[in-house]
């Protein structure tokens, strides 16, 4: 994978944020690591941070969380200055499975909290998984919770039948 052109991309630009319903601020643009190999992920993440990205978006199903964590560590950035998102894969849904899988993600990413955790797909035991995310949110382990790739009717169900509504409905957009 080619190196980022750090001289041009974010030169002189400031990071813009959006405030979520719970008051947490998320950078408008994030650096997604889907399909970045384990070999390339540490360098790519470090270079993205050096370039000015302040939101790193990963997922359990990308199989590179540990390498993303290494890239964050290598960058030397203070954790408080970075917004970190991961997504729970459907094989880790269900209350207990989700609690365990978030703990594994925390360890792989080398952090004691996550800024945003999303349910990656609208299949399997989404309600059990969501209740686990609600608990982790209330416990302060996760700063915001949401969904990704959910159909409008499934999103409406998540709002109607849970204590805490999703704070984010992620829809993939690429700038390149």
Which ranges hold each PLM region?
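Beta/alpha (TIM)-barrel catalytic core signal, keyed to glycine-rich beta->alpha loops juxtaposed to Asp/Glu
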Residues: 17, 121-176
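CE4/NodB-like, metal-dependent polysaccharide N-deacetylase domain
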Residues: 98-118, 135-139
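Generic structural signal for well-ordered alpha-helices
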Residues: 15, 45, 65-72, 99-103, ...
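Conserved, mostly hydrophobic/aromatic
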Residues: 31, 48, 56, 68, ...
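N-terminal binding-site loop/beta-alpha segment at the start of enzyme catalytic domains
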Residues: 2-82
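Short helix-capping segments at alpha-helix termini
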Residues: 74-81, 109-111, 137-141, 162-165
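A short, structured active-site edge motif that brings together acidic residues
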Residues: 79-92, 113-122, 149
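Short, acidic/polar
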Residues: 36-49, 93-109, 128, 153-157
């Amino acid at each position: 994978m080619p190196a980022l052109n750090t001289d041009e991309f974010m030169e002189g630009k400031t990071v813009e944020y959006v405030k979520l319903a719970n008051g947490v601020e998320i950078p408008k643009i994030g650096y997604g690591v889907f399909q970045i190999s384990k070999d390339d992920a540490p360098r790519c993440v470090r270079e993205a941070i050096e370039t000015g990205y302040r939101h790193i978006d990963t997922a359990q199903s990308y199989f590179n969380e540990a390498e993303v964590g290494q890239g964050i560590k290598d960058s030397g950035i203070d954790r408080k200055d970075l917004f970190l998102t991961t997504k729970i894969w459907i094989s880790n849904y269900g209350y207990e499975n989700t609690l365990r899988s978030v703990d594994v993600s925390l360890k792989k990413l080398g952090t004691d909290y996550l800024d945003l955790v999303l349910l990656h797909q609208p299949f399997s035991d989404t309600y059990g998984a969501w209740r686990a995310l609600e608990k982790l949110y209330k416990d302060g382990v996760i700063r915001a919770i949401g969904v990704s790739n959910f159909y409008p009717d499934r999103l409406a169900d998540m709002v109607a039948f849970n204590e805490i509504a999703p704070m984010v409905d992620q829809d993939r957009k690429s700038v390149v």
